[in-house]
Amino acid sequence: MALEIEARDVIKIMLQFCKENSLNQTFQTLQSECQVSLNTVDSVETFISDINSGRWDSVLPQVSQLKLPRNKLEDLYEQIVLEMIELRELDTARAILRQTQVMGVMKQEQAERYLRMEHLLVRSYFDPHEAYGDSTKERKRAQIAQAVAAEVTVVPPSRLMALIGQALKWQQHQGLLPPGTQFDLFRGTAAMKQDVEDTHPNVLTHTIKFGKKSHAECARFSPDGQFLASSSVDGFIEVWDYISGKLKKDLQYQADESFMMHDDPVLCIDFSRDSEMLASGSQDGKIKIWRIRTGVCIRRFDAHSQGVTSLSFSRDGSQLLSTSFDQTARIHGLKSGKLLKEFRGHTSYVNHAIFTSDGSRIITASSDCTVKVWDSKTTDCLQTFKPPPPLRGTDASVNSIHLFPKNTEHIVVCNKTSSIYIMTLQGQVVKSFSSGNREGGDFVAACVSTKGDWIYCIGEDKKLYCFNYQSGGLEHFMMVHEKDVIGITHHPHRNLLATYSEDCTMKLWKP
């Protein structure tokens, strides 16, 4: 059952924040536009005491921020004017009588009452009986204090900050926010350090070891940079702390060893753009959608007749694009749980697919050596092209395609050759990068740095190749694993790479 919160209460919390931080103009504007009154004081007892003692210099600033019934406000201001006349503070009495809005309204609607104060003001003496009638000054104060106090309440100070603090503590308690983590309140995520300069990693920081009979088939960083997830041939999906290289035990389900998992090897994973959901695809053609914070499976799809080779969320997180060994790409609806679109036309495995940045097209890469561009709504194939063949002349399987950050109409195409290409969606080669290897160095995987300044490729020779976009040259290469490397992924904000291999390890690299 959803917890309902009154909109007026939210406004009052905002008004209190404005009041406590002396944002007086904002306070008045918000109160006027929303027609919501705060009507709080720090202490009712002190407020009553100030009225009973005639400490009007303390009472007036508080009253100016309250919405009181007009008759009670008039009684209060009348009492202040009479007491100022009694003290012969005639300038103050005159200013209140002639310059305040309350007295101005009284002059128009209760002329006789108003003129009585004007007459008392110009007299050379003060007669308490004439001013207060059968009552006394003290009794008048007490009556006003009692009447005004009924209109105000007391709430704890700094409610906005207190509520935010409580929310953050709850997130920590639930394992959603690791202790000691800086939090970006505006974005609603833990604050992440962002590397200013895009540069290639070359130092091994951590080696994550899997079981002797297990290795990672896929790994991905979350878009917010908080998580590194891996999926393995043993069916397990694990979330890692890339800073320590250890399993994230602040996720309670992992601390309890209740891991996300499939019955078959998990070949691919992908995060939603808000980093809240993780999709996983397995060798038996099934897809599962998980809540990354809780490890709860929220949706299952019998998506393909054969293994799922790649997954990609739509920008708004409402759809999931999948590819398979069954030669198709498909779009699934997360809310409906149904197949929405199917893309047929490849004659071999579809290895990878992505949405274009505006979501209007999808791009697929296949072992039939082609890249296809499709209309995501009509499923029409708009373009089919092949990357340039290797020097030996035969076409090569296309492993993956990647959006290029520097131009949304360009893609990075990795096929099983020793070259990688930046191409247009019409199939024209914009730029190419080559390792120079004639044999044994064909690329099996690739990724692009956040800003697009570096393109990273993994070769069959177990080496990482780092290409500089500006120079077009191979700036660095190094051996990264002892056995065949399966894939590579780049952190969204940091100069950090993760590589994973059949040697049962995943390695983290930084500059």
Curated annotation (Swiss-Prot):
CDD domains: WD40
Gene knockout outcome: Lethal when homozygous.
Species assigned in the record: Arabidopsis thaliana (Mouse-ear cress)
Protein name: Suppressor of mec-8 and unc-52 protein homolog 1
Domain CTLH: 40-92
PANTHER family named among the record's database cross-references: WD40 REPEAT PROTEIN
Subcellular localization, as worded in the UniProt entry: Nucleus
Coiled coil: none
Similarity comment: family membership: Belongs to the WD repeat SMU1 family.
Subunit relationships: Component of the spliceosome B complex. Interacts with SMU2.
Residues recorded as bearing N-acetylalanine in the entry: A2
